[in-house]
């Protein structure tokens, strides 16, 4: 995240002097403990413990294992209130997280449960026009509602298939400046892979970590 964006976030709602929760900081937290004032506090939550995250990303070149932050709360089932032991916060922040949420409405409801009255939820969301999702349709409220009413706990068949069949090897910098190279349009997977993955979701409930919710500013 650019310094300008981090500075904007830190000034928002007096983050430096408030008690907050950051979801999914990994090795690049938006709010750093050392930047807070004496009355400010930040807690970190993820779906795995610090040690489990270090093991998961040990072979991932883009993630520096020794920089993964110390996780305060682990939430494996989506119940944020239970995971945080009933704590409430002045603000909750998450970057590039809700596009992965199998059940977006439930997640937002869970965030509401852990916010103090008048609290703030800050979400940093990718614009599909500048990501590998550029060819995918924007999510409708109908699809979001379906995931909520069906109590989805893993990415839907349609999300898994669409990712395989449409996601491209996009360079965000190129897309931002309107530059399109041949390699930027190459599919990350294929329709055949999408078909196989969709069947695995249907038969086994397999969890594929893909973008479920696709956004544009409008």
Task: Tell what function each PLM region has.
Residues 18-134:
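Conserved SAM-binding loop
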Residues 6, 28, 201:
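Residue-level detector of functional hotspots within protein domains
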Residues 3, 91, 203-204:
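General secondary-structure edge motif
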Residues 1-4, 103, 215-216:
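Soluble or luminal CAZymes and related metallo-dependent hydrolases
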Residues 13, 96-100, 209-217:
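Aromatic-acidic/polar surface patches that form glycan- and anion
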Residues 6-10, 81, 145-146:
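Generic detector of well-ordered alpha-helical segments enriched in charged/polar residues
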Residues 62-75, 106, 112-116, 120-218:
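S-adenosyl-L-methionine-dependent methyltransferase catalytic module, highlighting the catalytic core
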Residues 1-17:
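Class I SAM-dependent methyltransferase Rossmann-like catalytic core
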């Amino acid at each position: 995240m650019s310094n300008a964006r981090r500075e904007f976030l830190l000034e928002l709602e007096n983050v430096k002097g408030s008690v907050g929760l950051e979801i999914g900081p990994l090795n690049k937290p938006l709010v750093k403990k050392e930047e807070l004032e004496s009355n400010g506090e930040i807690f970190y939550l993820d779906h795995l413990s610090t040690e489990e995250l270090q093991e998961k990303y040990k072979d991932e070149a883009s993630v520096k294992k020794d920089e993964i932050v110390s996780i305060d709360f682990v939430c494996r089932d989506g119940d944020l209130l239970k995971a945080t032991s009933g704590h409430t916060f002045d603000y909750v922040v998450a970057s590039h997280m809700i596009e992965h949420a199998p059940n977006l409405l439930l997640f937002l409801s869970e965030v509401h449960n852990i916010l103090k009255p008048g609290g703030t939820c800050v979400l940093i969301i990718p614009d599909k026009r500048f990501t590998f999702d550029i060819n995918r349709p924007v999510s409708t409220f109908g699809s979001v509602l379906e995931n909520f009413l069906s109590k989805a706990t893993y990415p839907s068949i349609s999300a898994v298939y669409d990712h395989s069949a449409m996601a491209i090897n996009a360079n965000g910098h190129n897309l931002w400046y309107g530059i399109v190279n041949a390699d930027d349009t190459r599919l990350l997977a294929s329709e055949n892979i999408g078909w196989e993955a969709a069947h695995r979701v249907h038969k086994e409930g397999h969890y594929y970590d893909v973008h479920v919710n696709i956004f544009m500013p409008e």
